Amino acid sequence: MATLIKNGNLYQAGRIYQADVLIEDGKIKAIGKNLSDVVKENLVEIDATNKLVAPGLVDVHVHYRDPGFTYKETIHTGSLAAAHGGYTTVCAMPNLDPVPDTPELVEKMCSRNQEDGVVKVKQYGSITHGLKSEELVDFVGMKKAGAFAFSNDGSGVQTAGTMYQAMKSAAALNMAIVAHVEDNSLLFGGVMNAGKRADELGLPGILGISESSQIARDLLLAKETGVHYHVCHVSTKESVELVRLAKQHKINVTCEVSPHHLLLADVDIPGNDPYYKMNPPLRGVEDRQALIDSLLDGTIDMIATDHAPHSIDEKTGDMREASFGITGSETAFAMLYTKFVKTGIFTLEQLLQWMSINPAEKFGMEDAGELLPGKSADLAIFDLNKEYVIKEEDYLSKGINTPFTGEKVYGQTVLTMVDGQKVYQREEK
């Protein structure tokens, strides 16, 4: 049976134009006008008039908490949330219990991701055993087992020698090192950005140099080893300046920014509210502007949500005691479209480049990030014209820890398909 998506506004090859998309056997068979004439029988038609038809979004940074912390999220609920947000490929971080730090555990996670995920869930292997920055993993074995890349996300690799050896091993395999950059000796128990707002709230601050100092170290190591070094969730002006300089010197570096760091600064934190506690923290107004500018000038390559669900108890009370993290899969596209595209700061084409094309391209995902005949039919349909309210009751994630609940936005997901199969469809109310 074939599926025809009719009359949509298709994003392809950097432009948006009206076209039909014909899908057969999980693949895109044809793109063009009046394709209903191509298949006469057993054709399912989907009317996408006045809707955006885009390549499925790609998120290289999610936390699915499974195994070990399934009261926060599972592979299934996390992937449902991703589909709700228009994502068809996501990459799951290894801060799990047990940590996927052996070939056997990586293979098991890859199998579970395929079984339980409704979207394509790629698995990071850890850089060190137990995420402890000490003993390196079996890089060769973990690549063979299916590891997408290597990361100790949740904690930076604290010793330069360990990171250097990791980079050498990853480079030899043409694999990426994906780094949560944070020097633990510079944290001093902080819970939000160090600055005036932290002082006003009487809360301990996190210095921006805890991030940028480790980026500086790692960029020198990346230059020495030639590894593809990817920086997670950059958040400071100094960090992007370092990445910009490194790119000028032809160091093989890419980086991502999270939606919340584009949308909010520390001055937007209304009080001692754990829903505004994330790591890295919301930074200053100048930092936020630097992130926006760095997307526009190409220093920042992509947007990744850092989807980090927690239980209600873990995000209630005092910021000093609450867990770090914010959800993002279900709000990212709509919030960014509304706040940046509708206001003329970004174009729609740019937003899709950062949320789909670039992450797929930079990480060598040949079957993601573009709609072309012969490729997998991984796509999302968005309604850009109808305003709606982000409601807690609509979340498919177990986590509701986001300050964006209640926002009026545009860009609602109508339908998400993976390999030509519907994995999310909006219910009309």
From Swiss-Prot:
Reaction equations catalysed: (S)-dihydroorotate + H2O = N-carbamoyl-L-aspartate + H(+)
Pfam families xref list: Amidohydro_1
Residues that coordinate or bind Zn(2+) 1: 61, 63, 153, 306
Top EC group: hydrolase
GO cellular component: cytoplasm
Co-factor(s): Zn(2+)
PROSITE patterns to which the protein is assigned, alphabetical: DIHYDROOROTASE_2 (PS00483)
Name of this protein: Dihydroorotase
